[in-house]
Amino acid sequence: MSRIGKHPAIALLDSGITFKEVRQIHAKLYVDGTLKDDHLVGHFVKAVALSDHKYLDYANQILDRSEKPTLFALNSMIRAHCKSPVPEKSFDFYRRILSSGNDLKPDNYTVNFLVQACTGLRMRETGLQVHGMTIRRGFDNDPHVQTGLISLYAELGCLDSCHKVFNSIPCPDFVCRTAMVTACARCGDVVFARKLFEGMPERDPIAWNAMISGYAQVGESREALNVFHLMQLEGVKVNGVAMISVLSACTQLGALDQGRWAHSYIERNKIKITVRLATTLVDLYAKCGDMEKAMEVFWGMEEKNVYTWSSALNGLAMNGFGEKCLELFSLMKQDGVTPNAVTFVSVLRGCSVVGFVDEGQRHFDSMRNEFGIEPQLEHYGCLVDLYARAGRLEDAVSIIQQMPMKPHAAVWSSLLHASRMYKNLELGVLASKKMLELETANHGAYVLLSNIYADSNDWDNVSHVRQSMKSKGVRKQPGCSVMEVNGEVHEFFVGDKSHPKYTQIDAVWKDISRRLRLAGYKADTTPVMFDIDEEEKEDALCLHSEKAAIAFGIMSLKEDVPIRIVKNLRVCGDCHQVSMMISKIFNREIIVRDRNRFHHFKDGHCSCNGFW
């Protein structure tokens, strides 16, 4: 061993030389006949296998020339394959270790790499078998193996198993604690993750990233941004992975100013902008209603993948630019990028917002005929929405009946919305009943059905719907509107008076109401589910969250700054009408992202053209 340890080739191989250089050294030693020691071969196997997964076949050829492959060489192949596109091949080399008789035995490295392979495969049964093997071979107390098992069970979504492994460790080290923080955050238990995180004497960027990502994942976007700010205060270096989570949190909140600041932070700190990070930036600007900036980032990217194109297409569709969405799709195909299933969801939405039924049908048909993509439930949902929005309700019903899979609630929701828009009571009742069969606690179905009855002043059935909700314990989800002013996020809830500036907001809203009435405003009271007089209904509508947000925006933002609002529910008819009128009376641009789409209100018009 001492002689081999002094071989100059080993020092070169361990110094991180390029694959080309490794190959040159290997060829020279092979030709000279000096490449006979199995230990030296093992170092070549490692150098080639770990350089890039595309060289794994070459590494295997080197291994096959070894008379007695070492455990080091076989472990290197397991390690390389566990991080490759084919992690299942790791087990081929594990079986070679077992078939060697008593010459070789798996060690803790073998087991750790196999656990990582299971993590890549996301196969529960295989993972359990490997865990059992670690116990039988006495490696279950190895800290590297334990950390790997925590990551494996987190990947499988088995948080209880993560806790069992973690609790079995007498003194978990820094790496193990970080893995557990990551596991809990990934599985949605941000409370325990934060508790463990706060108790760590030192925290590396991985732990910080896990907390930011975890909060963003469960929708606690404000807390995700708070952790990011704490990370900066403690001087922890922020990387591109963390910035993706930060940008995602800004996107959820519709916090465009903070998103812009995060973008400038990336540029100031020279964080490498990968395709994934740039795609997240496109998504941020698109979902905050700034399509101009989204497309600026998009066209400025040197490299784009199918997800980048799909993100831009989705942004254009969401913001009501259906024709531009279809133009971009044509450019995408001309650029040689093959669309995937996600792409077609965006394309079909683009057709829907501009009412291009025939073109939408052609794109739907091309999925299978031209690209070999089998349409899934979401694609059929888009097709139903396309026909329903265009008023072709019978065709929409026919598509639902002929779908190869059972329609989900969102499909019936599209038909229900259209039934109300086109005043088809019979189909509206059918769609709502189908929705409630699938989701008995879906408050939206009850509300829309009651609105359909209210449109025709059928207060007996409105009352029946309300009683049905009450008897089943279904409550209408309270409306919440979020907006950002000077980098600070403000939340407004329906009927809530807790905002510190409520008195000023109320005064501004009263002035807005006065000017609306002078302009001829008459409240659309159909969203109010009670048979009460019109004045009481108007009072109820005044409490809607986006109206408070608009009032706050008018009093807080300069006239040339758009008022941007994110709402958790679909905008009601009255708020939609009011927003259009305010945009004209006050000469303000108002951008509302509700649960369905964007509404760009300007000069008394909305980008949705009355259908949302």
From Swiss-Prot:
Record-level Gene Ontology MF annotations: RNA binding; zinc ion binding
Region feature (Type E(+) motif): 487-517
Any one GO BP annotation for this protein: RNA modification
Type DYW motif: region residues: 518-612
Top-level taxon: Eukaryota
One Pfam family named in its UniProt record: E_motif
PPR repeats mapped onto the chain: 70-104, 107-141, 142-172, 173-203, 204-238, 239-273, 274-304, 305-339, 340-375, 376-410
Alphabetical UniProt keywords: Repeat
SUPFAM superfamilies linked: TPR-like
PROSITE patterns recorded: PPR
Family membership: Belongs to the PPR family. PCMP-H subfamily.
Name used for this protein in its record: Putative pentatricopeptide repeat-containing protein At5g40405
Species of origin: Arabidopsis thaliana (Mouse-ear cress)
Gene transcribed to yield this protein: PCMP-H14
